[in-house]
Structures are given as structure tokens and as C-alpha cells.
């Protein structure tokens, strides 16, 4: 008889905002590439008021300033603000590309099959097929996720305005559930995945089979934005750990992670010392200083101690009868 057991990976992941090592492979954050500029865009203000960004207790904790003004360059970094409509000018983009902008420019390409994914909260099957070569294909355990791929030498530019989801290895395309506002412009992202290894033992009546079979089951994919859209070969390249998009295999949805920032300094801090800690099965995100990193043994011991205390308290709770003994 065959038996199966899932060996989940550690519930804590951490990585710095720098790429762990320079490599051209496509695995995890080793594929961090690129630094580029957005296509020319126009910002239209709906309300004539100044922009002041405040960091509340939920988003940040530390000795940094709680309020600061944004300069013109940082305004371009603000995505999906309700006060603005972002419009692309294809003609201006073509002129900028022809003007010798270099490899850093991301050429704007109008999709003929474009369909907006903003505002959908449930799947909607479309009646056409897409050219999968024009999309980033993210293969998860329960589905395949497609995000439009603008042409770029580094192959890490994402257009979140057009996305599709299908059952694994099928061509039944539907619009995924979008649970948070998505960027309305091209951005560069580094991809990583979160999952576990499923280890299967062979049946007794098949002794010649391998002793076990291990399969990687990806439950979530994380897309982390490159800070200021810089390429990985840029000397100032870092990851913007505050902007992470999470694709969930089970719900076939995409959302933006809520990240807790404990590093002081606000948006103008030195991000090269940021360390992202992911816990609770890929649902909890926190940015700490790289100097506060714990070694894996300490983390495991702390988690086991917490779980042991909870299990013991649950057991002792069954033996207590305060509601009865208080009568005596």
C-alpha cells in the first residue's frame, strides 16, 4: 500500500533586498535582473492638493520620521493612487525609444487582445486563446498563471493590466481574481516561489521502484518590484521589499502583500540593509534590519517552544473545571 506525507518547508523565509549571488539562472531571486525606465506617462490630479505620505503604526515601527514630503522623482514611484489616472502616450513612447534611450527603456506595446483585469473579484472565462509566448507563465500546483510580458532583453518586465489563469496545462483561459489594485504601468519584478516537497513512498509490491519520489508543490509565487525599476546590473540595484505581489494557487488570485516595516528612515532609508521575513505560510511579511537576522536554529527552537506551550495549555485546559470547582 502506498503512503504519502508532505514535508513542508520552514514557515520562515528571509532574504535581503540585494540578490544573493550574481547568476544568470532563472531560479528564485538569482534571476533578479534589470533596471529600466517607464514609458512616458501623464499624471492627472483629480483633486488639487499637495501629496503628503504618512507612515502609521501599522506600516512602520522605529525611530524614523512619521511624515515626509515626496519630491518629483518619488511621485513617479507611487502606484495606484486614487487621486491620479495614469495614461500612456504610445507616440511619446515611440519617440523616446527612437531617441536613443538605451536598453534601460521599456518599449510600450499595445496588445490587440488586451482585456482589463481591474475590478474583477471572480473568475470569468474568455472565449479566445492567447499567445502564451507573449506572457510570463507561472506554474503553480493548482493552476497556471499568465501575466503579459512586454518585450525586454532581461525578460523580467510585467504588465499586470492583462492576466489570465488556467487549470494546469490547459487552454481554458479565465480572468483571475484581483484582490488589490494592480500597477497601471510596466514594472520590473523578481520572482520567487513558496511551497513544499511532497514525498511519496513506493508500494510494497513494487520493490524495484525508487525508494521515494519527491515533488515540488508550489502554492504561492511572490513578485517583488525592483526599486525604481533598476536593472540587476545597475550598481544601485535593490529590491523594493515594500511592494510584493502574491499569486495564490488555491484561490487562483493575485493580491498585494501587506508588509510591516520595522526599519527606521521611511522611504528615503538605505534599502541595501533591508531583510524581508516571510512567515505563517506566506501570509505575514515584515522588513527588518539585516543585523537583526536570527540563525535558523534559533528560529526553529523558538517556534517549537511556542507550539509546545500551546499544546500543553490545550491539554491542561481539559483538566480544569473552574466553573464546577468554584462552587465548593
Swiss-Prot record:
A motif (RNA binding domain) lies at residues 301-319. GO terms for cellular component: chloroplast; chloroplast nucleoid; chloroplast thylakoid; cytoplasm; nucleoplasm; nucleus; plastid-encoded plastid RNA polymerase complex. PANTHER family: EXPRESSED PROTEIN, PLASTID TRANSCRIPTIONALLY ACTIVE PROTEIN 6, CHLOROPLASTIC. Subunit of the plastid-encoded RNA polymerase (PEP) complex. Component of a large nuclear subcomplex that may include other PEP subunits (e.g. PTAC12/HMR/PAP5, PTAC14/PAP7 and PTAC7/PAP12). Binds directly to PTAC12/HMR/PAP5 in the nucleus. Interacts with MTERF5. Disruption phenotype: Lethal without exogenous carbon sources. Reduced expression of plastid-encoded genes with plastid-encoded multimeric promoters (PEP). Strongly reduced presence of both plastid- and nuclear-encoded soluble polypeptides and polypeptides associated with the thylakoid membrane in chloroplasts. Albino plants unable to produce primary leaves white cotyledons that fails to accumulate chlorophyll (Chl) even in low light, thus leading to high nonphotochemical quenching (NPQ). Its main location: plastid. Essential protein involved in plastid gene expression and in chloroplast biogenesis. Links photomorphogenesis and chloroplast biogenesis through its dual localization; required for the formation of late photobodies in the nucleus, as well as for phytochrome B-mediated signaling cascade and subsequent reshaping of the plastid-encoded RNA polymerase (PEP) activity. Binds RNA via specific recognition motifs of viral origin. Recruited by MTERF5 to the transcriptionally paused region of psbEFLJ. Promotes leaf greening. Keywords: Chloroplast, Nucleus, Plastid, RNA-binding, Thylakoid, Transcription, Transcription regulation, Transit peptide. It is found in: Plastid, Chloroplast; Plastid, Chloroplast thylakoid; Nucleus; Nucleus, Nucleoplasm. Induction: Induced by cytokinin (e.g. trans-zeatin). Probably regulated by HY5 in response to light. Mostly expressed in rosette leaves, stems and flowers, and, to a lower extent, in roots and cauline leaves. This is PLASTID TRANSCRIPTIONALLY ACTIVE protein 6, chloroplastic. The keyword Transcription applies. Residues 1-14 have a biased composition (Low complexity). Residues 1-21 are annotated as: Disordered. One of its GO terms (molecular function) is RNA binding. InterPro entries: PTAC6. It comes from the Eukaryota. One of its GO terms (biological process) is response to light stimulus. Residues 1-59 form a transit peptide. A motif (Nuclear localization signal) lies at residues 267-275.
